[in-house]
Structure formats: C-alpha cells, structure tokens
Design a protein with these regions (language model features):
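Glycan-recognition and catalytic cores of secretory/periplasmic carbohydrate-active enzymes
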Residues: 1-227
Length: 227
C-alpha cells in the first residue's frame, strides 16, 4: 500500500534545506519523523537494512519488509547500506542527534566486517549473492560510502582517522584502472562496474551517473580535509 525505500533517506537533505531557506520548520519536522520511523523499522539487529518497508496506509502498521533490488529479502544489498550510511550521516549533520550517527556507523561496520567484503573494498552488488566471488561489484555503493566516511571523519567520533583511512582505500581502488575508465571510453563516464538492479535485469555491470557523482563529491571532500 505504501512502500518506503531506504533510498528516501537521501532526499531528506532537501527538506532540511527547505527549512533553512523558508524559515518554516514543517520541512525539518517531516525529515526527522521520516528518519525516526526508518530508524525503527528498516534495520536488522546486526545493523544492515531492508530495501523496502511497506506500510498500511490507514494505520501506519508494517505490512511487509523486503529487498527488491537485492538478492533476497534478508540479504545485504550493498547500495541500500550505502544509502543508509550516507542518509543518516546527513541527519546527524542537520540535527546533531547522536542516534543518527550511531546508526550510520553501525551499518558501516556491518559492511566493513562482512566476510565477503573484497580486499579492494568495492562491494559485491549484494553481500549475500549466491555466486561470490563471481558476482558483479557495485562501484556506486563504494563511492557513496567513501563520501559519507569523509564527512564522518570530521565529527567527534572515536577513531575518526580510521574512517578517513578506509575511505582512502576505497578511493584508491576506484581510481585504479580496474574501475576508472580511460578517457573517452565508457560512454564518457568516470567509473565502470556499477549495478542498478540484477533482479530486474537492469543496469548490470555498467557506468551509473550517481556512482560518478559520489566519486567526485568524495574527491572534493578528501581535498577539503587537507585545507
């Protein structure tokens, strides 16, 4: 009836900005309410998240939890984890409520410690996909996570330098010939090897514009850290 995707966390930045620009706190309150409900319903005990939570539109109860673009409902779809890490980092930035940063870190640590995380730190499209290591990687998840980690490293968190160092390792991999396309190739996209949705047979092992976006954002954030 009312499916809500973890991707929506990325849109809350617009609502926070709308309050700043308009002076109307309604947008801020909507963003916080959305983040809080997502916090309570989208996450598993280990910190990983579902892709979709379907709500009953009449009473707000949960009808179903699933992972539409991942391997299975209970699997760890990599880009969903990236949206969660980045989105809750946004919420911490805008509210300074520590619970949001704690969730971002918990989800990141779940990804970092996944036994299937490759040595180059570019995740498989789903960390529970059945044919690992012969599964497509997802550079878009990696670039989004790296960008979020650079922001996290600027906050008063224990071992902040380790988040920066982990992001550096991701970016080193993405900038290598394994993932960064030669000039004039790859449809003029920067990064190769992203995945849209394997269950929908859509955008498999291709360049994606948002992979490039977060790669460029991460590069800028990394440069800003040296100022």
């Amino acid at each position: 009836e009312c499916p809500v995707i973890i991707d929506n966390m990325m849109n809350l930045e617009l609502l926070f900005e709308a309050t700043k620009l308009s002076g109307d706190s309604t947008f801020y309150k909507v963003a916080v309410a959305h983040a809080d409900r997502t916090l309570s319903e989208h996450f598993r005990p280990d910190g990983s998240c579902y892709h979709v939570v379907d709500y009953n539109i009449s009473d707000g109860s949960v009808r179903h939890k699933q992972t539409a673009q991942g391997y299975a409902d209970e699997s760890v779809w990599s880009r969903g984890q990236a949206w969660a890490i980045y989105g809750f980092t946004i919420c911490y930035r805008e509210t300074k409520d520590r619970k949001y940063l704690d969730q971002a870190l918990k989800t990141f640590n779940r990804m970092k410690n996944d036994p299937h995380m490759p040595e180059d730190l570019i995740p498989y499209w789903d960390m529970d996909a059945p044919n690992i290591p012969n599964e497509p990687r997802d550079a878009s998840s990696a670039s989004c996570i790296a960008s979020a980690l650079y922001e996290i490293s600027t906050y008063a968190v224990s071992d902040a330098a380790s988040y920066k160092a982990y992001a550096d390792r991701i970016m080193h991999s993405l900038a290598s010939p394994d993932y960064r396309a030669a000039l004039g190739t790859n449809g003029n996209f920067i990064l190769m090897h992203s995945v849209g949705s394997i269950p929908h047979n859509s955008e498999i092992d291709v360049p994606l514009n948002y992979a490039d976006y977060y790669f460029l954002e991460a590069l800028k954030r990394r440069k800003d850290l040296d100022k």
